[in-house]
Amino acid sequence: MAELEFKRPYTEVTAMVIGVQPIGEYDRRVVLLTRERGKISAFAKGARRPNSQLVAATDLFVFGTFRLYAGRDSYTLVEASVQNYFPWFRMHIEASLEGQYFCEVLEYCTRENNDEAQLLLLLYQTLRALESGKFPARLVRSIFELKTVVIEGEMREPNPQKYLPAVMAALHHIERAPIAKLYSFSLDEPAQKELAELARRCMEFAFERHTFRSLEILEVMEV
């Protein structure tokens, strides 16, 4: 009698790596922000070995399709088809820190099995905007922060009398524009500073003054 063949319950997700942690001598634990299942963690066995097929696929910012084995209590990464490595960030320290901050924010505020597709798209478009060099990094950060707060449903409308008209116009654009058209405006220096302050206040309210380590490093570098 032929033996029955049992197929493992594989799952495929479109995702970006937003967190990486070494495990033991050769393995990695990755945090994936997925289109289908929200934020999930997966173990990548042997991913730190030089000849592993998972070495490059488990770096921060990697975007693509990930094939996972769903175990009883966790996922195991089996293979990945990478669509974008975002290699530019590995050559620019400050930009890399900005990207790490974006990932840290989303790792903090997203949940497993939530619909986080909009935040995944926001992260992808934000990295592309920063990579393009068309926008000041601080403006990109402010836009990302405000749109994240909007998507999370935590936006409180500011008093328009306290801000420049250009800042209020920018805020209304951020609130209403589809993510694909989010990064399509510029501001002069005074307006950028006001927008940054508004974004800071909104983030503090939305996330209860949570400390983001990568942001602390960025702020030290900006002094």
Question: Across the structure, where does each feature detected by a protein language model lie?
Answer:
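Non-catalytic alpha-helical scaffolds and adjoining flexible linkers that form interface surfaces
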Residues: 1-28, 33-223
